[in-house]
């Protein structure tokens, strides 16, 4: 090591050219010198290269397998096994495609966007949200009913990409790997089988506008959420790697499928239709073909951009009871945690869970209606509980859900007492 005052000869760093008087230390080698500043710079370069290599290695190894994706979805969404399998494979292949480094001569892998078909409250949105949270990518929900063609009153389709950019603080590279869920996609179906002389700006027109966005194009988005105007610089976002998931209830689609699958005739030699009264609409939806979606009102080009079609079953009473109790964020667990903040335990009896599920079925709102039923049943209890002293437990039974009784309050030193109305 060469110190600043050693010898009469002035020494210089062989890398940056600084003299021994301009640096703190000068390290000597065989006819070579390096200063402490260059050593520190080399350490920084090596550290960055190691971090980049580790991140690339971690990116490929962190991608869960389809089995793992489906297993994580099971923790949040009850049932819908076939839809989970289709989603898991499609998402795995999509992000494997993004993380693979393909050369110029390699085969180009096309993107497989997804169409989810199922009744309201069956878990379409929750599946997409859980996938985005699992993969740690930006996620945004768009409502197809608010979209119109460019130039008309309503939201432009490029507003979807603007929302995605806002989600990730206008980090374009991060937005390019996001997931966009377009809800109520069935509401932009063509209004009639034959083209009308009046322009359909919220139906077929929106489908036409979404075509390029879903397939992959460069969208021009105003910076920081501003409105479009001339002489403005736009943020350019390539949508080729954004995964689009479209979902809708497609009410009436089962009739289209039934018309295709059940053939009949007229006359003595006609084959009599064997209409299975027990054949549920959900079973028919599993037989959906692209031609059915086209007849329903989606244009052929739009159907072609959604090659992966997954159907969700309508939830029955048993599935709704499972949704109330089994998922990680089950409603009974959420309300139990809410009551625990007051120092009170909350118990749902089995007859109460069945009653909640039956009421949700009557409302035909699926799992989405479960929370409102519980909120309504526990409204008075949550209003009075903070003012009551000594309550250790609240028990919810069938009588409370049906509106014929009050919850049982268990006090720390007394027996069961029903909560008096307006107490």
UniProtKB/Swiss-Prot annotation:
Name a single GO biological process: proteolysis involved in protein catabolic process
Q: Which UniProt keywords apply?
A: ATP-binding, Chaperone, Metal-binding, Nucleotide-binding, Zinc
Q: Which GO terms describe its molecular function?
A: ATP binding; ATP hydrolysis activity; ATP-dependent protein folding chaperone; protein dimerization activity; unfolded protein binding; zinc ion binding
A single GO CC term for this protein reads:
HslUV protease complex
Please report the stretch or stretches of sequence annotated as the ClpX-type ZB domain: 1-54
Q: Where, in this chain's numbering, is ATP bound?
A: 119-126
Please indicate if the UniProt record lists Amino-acid biosynthesis as a keyword: no
Family indicated by similarity: Belongs to the ClpX chaperone family.
Describe its partners and assembly state.
Component of the ClpX-ClpP complex. Forms a hexameric ring that, in the presence of ATP, binds to fourteen ClpP subunits assembled into a disk-like structure with a central cavity, resembling the structure of eukaryotic proteasomes.
Q: What does this protein do?
A: ATP-dependent specificity component of the Clp protease. It directs the protease to specific substrates. Can perform chaperone functions in the absence of ClpP.
Q: Supply the PANTHER family for this chain.
A: ATP-DEPENDENT CLP PROTEASE ATP-BINDING SUBUNIT CLPX-LIKE, MITOCHONDRIAL (PTHR48102:SF7), ATP-DEPENDENT CLP PROTEASE ATP-BINDING SUBUNIT CLPX-LIKE, MITOCHONDRIAL-RELATED (PTHR48102)
Q: What is this protein called?
A: ATP-dependent Clp protease ATP-binding subunit ClpX
Q: Which gene encodes it?
A: clpX
């Amino acid at each position: 090591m060469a110190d600043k005052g050693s010898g009469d000869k002035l020494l210089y760093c062989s890398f940056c050219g600084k003299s021994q008087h301009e640096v703190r230390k000068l390290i000597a080698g065989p006819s070579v010198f390096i200063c402490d500043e260059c050593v520190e710079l080399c350490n920084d370069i090596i550290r960055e290269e190691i971090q980049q290599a580790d991140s690339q290695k971690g990116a490929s190894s962190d991608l869960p397998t389809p089995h793992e994706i489906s297993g994580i979805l099971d923790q949040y969404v009850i049932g819908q096994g076939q839809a989970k399998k289709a989603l898991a494979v499609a998402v795995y292949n999509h992000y494997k495609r993004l993380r693979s480094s393909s050369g110029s001569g390699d085969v180009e892998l096309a993107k497989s966007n997804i169409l989810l078909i199922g009744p309201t409250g069956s878990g379409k949105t929750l599946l997409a949200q859980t996938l985005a949270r699992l993969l740690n990518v930006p996620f945004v929900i768009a409502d197809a009913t608010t979209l119109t063609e460019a130039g008309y009153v309503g939201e432009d389709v490029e507003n979807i990409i603007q929302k995605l950019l806002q989600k990730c603080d206008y980090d374009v590279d991060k937005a390019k790997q996001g997931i966009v869920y377009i809800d109520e996609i069935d509401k932009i179906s063509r209004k009639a089988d034959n083209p009308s002389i009046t322009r359909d700006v919220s139906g077929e027109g929106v489908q036409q506008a979404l075509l390029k966005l879903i397939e992959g194009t460069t969208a021009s988005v105003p910076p920081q959420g501003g409105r479009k105007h001339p002489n403005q610089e736009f943020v350019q976002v390539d949508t080729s790697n954004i995964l689009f998931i479209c979902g809708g209830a497609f009410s009436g689609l089962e009739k289209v499928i039934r018309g295709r699958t059940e053939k009949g005739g007229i006359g003595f030699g006609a084959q009599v239709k064997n209409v299975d009264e027990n054949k549920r609409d959900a079973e028919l939806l599993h037989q959906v073909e692209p031609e059915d979606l086209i007849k329903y009102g989606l244009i052929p080009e739009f159907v072609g951009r959604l090659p992966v079609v997954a159907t969700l079953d309508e939830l029955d009473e048993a599935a709704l009871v499972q949704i109330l109790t089994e998922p990680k964020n089950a409603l009974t667990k959420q309300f139990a945690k809410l009551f625990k903040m007051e120092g009170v335990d909350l118990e749902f009896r089995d007859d109460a869970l069945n009653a909640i599920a039956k009421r949700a079925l009557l409302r035909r709102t699926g799992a989405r209606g479960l929370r409102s039923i519980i909120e309504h049943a526990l409204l008075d209890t949550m209003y009075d509980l903070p003012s009551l002293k000594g309550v250790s437990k609240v028990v919810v039974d069938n009588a409370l859900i049906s509106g014929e009784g009050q919850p049982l309050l268990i006090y720390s030193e007394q027996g069961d007492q029903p909560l008096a109305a307006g107490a």
